[in-house]
Amino acid sequence: MVPISRHRRLYLLNRLFLYTIISIVYGSEIHDKQINKSFIMFAGAKFNLVQNGDSPNRYIWLHGDEQTARMALEYHIGLYNGLAFFIESETREIPFKSTIVDPNRIFSRDGAYYALRKFKPGWQPGTLKMALDEIDRERESFLDILMPNKNGLLISLHNNFRGYNVHKEKGNSQRISIKKNENPRDFIICTNSSDFEILVSSPYNVVLQNELPERDDGSLSWEALRRNVRYFNIETRLGYLSKQKAMLKYIEDNLN
């Protein structure tokens, strides 16, 4: 028997892992309510995948310190079909190489550049480029699974507890609908004008962001916009679980 090199063995293991992930994502047509679980890695972070039935919809929880968003998504994916991504973290930033990064600031090379230098301004010659190249490679594999097809929705769930509110998004927004009875810290960002028209009639604050900014901060929303994906960010105050569950349900029931 010819011995298998270490490089070849790692290659085969990676191919097997990718095949397992793809089978989970696309191979659940037998039972609509079958729950499948696996994981994928991106930039040193582990994302647990939970799939319920067969749907193009994708959901993601990105910040480990936003636990209300996690609970809302766990509840939702048990009731509705789709594939949910849960980051395995308890903090906002995740460790990567010799620094930490915000996982919602590395969905473009420019964003990753600023994210890597935020907590570590000085890098040894050549090492920053190597780190960026590694994130680039992993990003493509991650997004191949995360991004839905043309009929699906991509929904990200976030919480705020530092004064962040809908008014801070006005500069990046093309259209705005603010409800007088709604707290400004509870709102929806969407990237599709037709979806915005429907959400205007909802009880929730909503902004439309369908033009790329001058400076790309690496957030998932801009990558979704570049790919013409129907993206939603459901943002609520930390601890307002019922609110976030209701907002998620509204999108599911009215925009599918």
Predicted regions and their residues:
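Short intrinsically disordered, low-complexity coil segments enriched in acidic
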Residues: 1-2, 18
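Structured catalytic-domain cores with a bias toward divalent-metal coordination
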Residues: 3-13, 25-256
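Bacterial N-terminal signal peptides
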Residues: 15-23
